[in-house]
């Protein structure tokens, strides 16, 4: 049941060196720098996104994800979700408007998986970058690198998947689009959606809490993914796997690392889903094909390198 959460809105990442990180996220991925704040954070967006930012970079000594944020339809829905989280037993933290530049107040909570999430209703509307709102051209001609279309999702590793599933489905209004079941029928991976996408956030069982597997950005075509692979080679960027196709979600994809070790994905295509669809199910014994549909063999680095 929809509770008023519309979409993934932003992610804040820790990076070791800001100038090197910007080479990755701006020059290679093609995000646009929109702002900086007095904490030294840098605010980025993809060109089709209408709000001011979707990625925030913060320079620290350890890489990883600080939090992921979801945009809520309005302040009334935000207040109701805050009440629902509190009634469910979640400790919520209030962050005032302006703590993130150009963003309204945020309600932050920690999932049983150990990850921090936040909800907000207001962010400065800047429109799509480089095109007019009336009679817009197909795309801006001065995009850089891979010309990422949008911030799409995060895949996260942590424990307590059943409790995390209950929180996201019962309180926040997500639904289960795809899953992986082990030989006992226990869900070891859950792909949760707010929309018609195969996932807006996904969780994989892992004994450590609060780990980041990757942040993903959408491209339009398979040719764009192949071009991304060319750019990865041209820039001598550390590659993880791909180009290939997933069995899970059926997305066509490539994975690579930022200079701090955070994993990035760019992808195109993939399954669509609706809340009345039965979840797409893969079996853990076939996980090689579920993740790497062509090779059908697991890559240890893909499974174990986390931030």
Curated annotation (Swiss-Prot):
Gene Ontology biological-process annotations: toluene catabolic process
Disulphide-bridged cysteine pairs: none
Keywords: Aromatic hydrocarbons catabolism, Dioxygenase, Iron, Metal-binding, Oxidoreductase, Repeat
InterPro entries: Catechol_2-3_dOase, Fosfomycin_Res_Enzymes, Glyas_Bleomycin-R_OHBP_Dase, Glyas_Fos-R_dOase_dom, VOC, Xdiol_ring_cleave_dOase_1/2, XylE-like_N
PROSITE patterns: EXTRADIOL_DIOXYGENAS, VOC
Pathway it works in: Xenobiotic degradation; toluene degradation
Cofactor(s) listed in the protein's UniProt record: Fe(2+)
One Gene Ontology term of the molecular function aspect: ferrous iron binding
Annotated ranges, domain VOC: 7-122, 150-269
Summary of subunit composition and partner proteins: Homotetramer.
Stated name of the protein: Metapyrocatechase
